[in-house]
Amino acid sequence: RLIYYAFIMIVVVLIIPLFIVKSCTAGLDDKPVQEAPQSVVTLELKPEEIAVYNAESKTVHSMDLEEYVKCVVAAEMPAEFEIEALKAQAVAARTYAFTRMLNSYDGRDDLHQGADVCTDPGHCQAWVSKETAMSHWEEEKAEVYWGKIERAVEETRGIIITYEDTVANPVFHSNSGGRTENADNV
């Protein structure tokens, strides 16, 4: 009688679920799922200089693109974040700046005084100088944080976002006010 109960338990616990699980996949193709092709585009970005309109000082100055990206990352994202998040921000910031350098996207209201980008976060990307960024951090952490930002930018040097062989327009908003804007208006 004990053997009978053991046999029934094995059938109930193992065999029946096996048929149920097998029947759930019965009509599915065994073809592998085809994933979209992914690629990382690394370019030798030229020109390497970007013209920046400083909204505070109302001056235009030229700087190295990678130095500009460091200052954007410092302004846009807390340095305490993980290095991979900082790298993603660096790629997005570089792509945004690069598209503006190429005049790839319309919509400039000449708020830049002839420059590629401005430092007004309400119009372009937030930007702070290295000195300003370091003054916002605790003194003993400032060098570590700046080094982390430099590493994120250096490890992604030349990498931009593309979609269907075109440089992407990586716009975003930091505050939606409870609703999002129509994409046509961005």
In which residue ranges do the predicted regions lie?
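Conserved, single-site charged/polar hotspot
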Residues: 1-186
